[in-house]
Amino acid sequence: MTHCCSPGCQPTCCRTTCCRTTCWQPTIVTTCSSTPCCQPSCCVSSCCQPYCHPTCCQNTCCRTTCCQPTCVTSCCQPSCCSTPCYQPICCGSSCCGQTSCGSSCGQSSSCAPVYCRRTCYHPTTVCLPGCLNQSCGSSCCQPCYCPACCVSSCCQHSCC
C-alpha cells in the first residue's frame, strides 16, 4: 500500500490525495513516516464533506447515518457506525426530545408524529418531512443506491 508521505513531505504534516476513497478529500496525516493511506488514522475533521463514505461516522457536518448516540468528531472512524439507520427511528435527530438512537419515535402519547429527516449523501438513507412512520412504516426510510442525492417523501422516492 502506498504510504501517505512522499519524500518531499514535511516530517509531521503531510498533504496527500491517496485517501480519497476513505476521506473524500486530500487529508492531513500527522504521522508521515509509516501510516498507510486510506485508513481511519489518516483522517481528520477536514474530510467531513458531502459524499460521505457509507461506513464512516461523521459529526453534523456530514449529516451522519450513525446509529449510536455518541460519534467521534473526526471522520473515518467506523466504530460508531456498526448499525446502519434503515428504519424510521431516532438517529441523531430531534425525536420527541431524544438525541440518541435505537428507540422508536412517535409511539408515546407524549410524542407528536416524528419525521425521519436526513440529508442523503450516496449511499445512505433519507426521509423528509411528510414521511410519517405511522403512514409509511419501515419502508419510509430505505437505502439510496443512486449516484447522487436521493430524497423520499412518504415513500415516494426521487433522485437528483
Swiss-Prot record:
Protein keywords: Keratin, Repeat
Function: In the hair cortex, hair keratin intermediate filaments are embedded in an interfilamentous matrix, consisting of hair keratin-associated proteins (KRTAP), which are essential for the formation of a rigid and resistant hair shaft through their extensive disulfide bond cross-linking with abundant cysteine residues of hair keratins. The matrix proteins include the high-sulfur and high-glycine-tyrosine keratins.
Organism: Homo sapiens (Human)
Listed GO CC annotations: cytosol; keratin filament
InterPro entries in the cross-refs: KAP (IPR002494)
A Pfam match: Keratin_B2_2
Family: Belongs to the KRTAP type 9 family.
Sequence repeats: 4-8, 13-17, 18-22, 37-41, 42-46, 47-51, 56-60, 61-65, 66-70, 75-79, 80-84, 90-94, 95-99, 140-144, 149-153, 154-158
Oligomeric and partner information: Interacts with hair keratins.
Keyword Repeat in annotation: yes
Name listed for the protein in its UniProt record: Keratin-associated protein 9-6
UniProt keyword Repeat present: yes
Region (16 X 5 AA repeats of C-C-[GSVRQ]-[QTSPHN]-[TPSGYC]): 4-158
